[in-house]
């Protein structure tokens, strides 16, 4: 598993046959797999939920932002650090980030499917943002060099495309063509 620049490094370094990534590195072509809604969420007892009004960017900046560490070796950045929060905790794993949010240690931007169980159980609640309550990220399947990809990797890429298309169709969303 890699995040942000780490995925680009794996592709450009020839260490993987293909990758699923939210950005296509310069010089590569990618096939759109799906679009993912991303939402801000925190535990129901978090102070942001206690304000009782739509939240502003200023409100978010005053609270701890939980972000995921970039796996890149050369250039690092944290995911979800768009707001420049005064406080932030950086995690290496999504599960740790989700657990910290559920415990009320801060808020984070999550792909909605990643926290579906926590939202359904009430352990996390979407933040009532005045604007920008939902973002979207696109996921692409990018081959390092399609002509050099072996039969197993080619088959796996085809299975991923088909699985994503089926899952998206089951939810009434547009997804990858098989």
Where are these regions (language model features)?
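Conserved alpha-helical elements of sugar-nucleotide-dependent glycosyltransferases
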Residues: 3, 152
């Amino acid at each position: 598993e890699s995040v942000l620049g780490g995925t680009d490094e794996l592709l450009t370094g020839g260490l993987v046959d293909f990758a699923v990534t939210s950005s296509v590195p310069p010089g590569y072509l990618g096939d759109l797999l799906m679009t993912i809604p991303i939402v801000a969420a925190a535990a129901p007892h978090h102070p942001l939920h206690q304000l009782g009004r739509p939240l502003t960017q200023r409100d978010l900046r005053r609270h701890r932002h939980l972000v995921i560490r970039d796996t890149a070796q050369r250039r690092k950045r944290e995911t979800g650090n768009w707001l420049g929060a005064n406080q932030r905790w950086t995690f290496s794993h999504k599960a740790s980030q989700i657990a910290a949010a559920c415990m009320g240690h801060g808020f984070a931007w999550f792909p909605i499917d990643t926290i579906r169980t926590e939202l359904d159980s009430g352990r996390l609640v979407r933040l009532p943002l005045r604007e920008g309550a939902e973002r979207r990220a696109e996921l692409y399947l990018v081959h390092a060099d399609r002509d050099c990809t072996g039969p197993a990797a080619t088959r796996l890429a085809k299975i991923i495309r088909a699985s994503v298309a089926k899952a998206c169709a089951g939810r009434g969303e547009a997804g990858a063509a098989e």
